[in-house]
């Protein structure tokens, strides 16, 4: 293993290269710019940052696209950070070089891996072809257009079975994403269907969950109970099929197994909210198997460094610290980005990096239009419109955009509530 002294105490003119412009990567870059005057390169395959927690609000028109998906060239204007639009093809950790599919190559002094995750369809036939994903702004508009089209066709068909299928939405996965999607659509679809002359009670939204309960690993028992209750109290009650394993997805039909029996659900809309896979480039890294977890994520030190490559840091969905695992959320990735920046600066100054600390405010979950449930410090729960206000203010506080103007007006509100609760 190479020594830290050899790596970090030289006047190396090479840049710090950051792969991935999500929360971990973007905020590592922005914090580094405040700490370090040398060259910084941020590489992403998209022109725009995507604030994924607020994609539901984009679908419901509660926020606008420019708020949650600002362009990198606008975010980084006059920052001194170089943005490169490109797709990473390979990383040579020994030679300390990144290659893009365009043929461009970048040697680095320090490397930040923040490529996130990709959708895994778990080998289920037809899932990739016939289910809609929900990860980008494009996905939001595609889903919205698809749903509006199905609602319009439903008002024109005389066939009862066809109408039932057109008005049925199957959501695969009962984790946080699936529950938030179901609650959002249960309030949203009636607002689209009623003006067309439709009866909102004809709309059916069903969660297909392979496990024995929803939100099994992502929330407390109390928040899970709140979510279950809220799903029933939406404008359209949400159905939940537990222990239902999807076997195949065909055009307009989902096949699933429940209690040993194969069943079919006619649904013109299938939304895929389960299954994450590591980025292909992360998969291809020359990393020993013992330095990956069972999901192929990179195991990192408490300092967020790779064990055998101390000049390389990793954060966000593609990495996990085994002694202190954190949920794959925006709150965590944002703080990891800041920690990575400070540790890179420490190495450049010939100092030892320090363990990253992550302070979670709580769990934030959207449970319908204009409503959320917020569990703070794992002790206090606030829901409804007040919960939504706290959720929005908390998320928008992270945004390096004009959203901060909103936070300047409302951030005090969130902080004061948190302080008051902490005193109880």
Question: Can you annotate each of these PLM segments?
Answer:
Residues 79, 83-90, 186-302, 353:
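A Rossmann-like FAD-binding core segment of flavoenzymes
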Residues 24, 116-119, 182, 276-278:
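Short glycine-rich anion-binding loops that position phosphate/pyrophosphate groups of nucleotides
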Residues 2-4, 332, 336-424:
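C-terminal, flexible cofactor-proximal segment of oxidoreductases
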Residues 2-82, 169, 176-218, 271:
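Beta1-alpha1 glycine-rich phosphate/pyrophosphate-binding loop at the start
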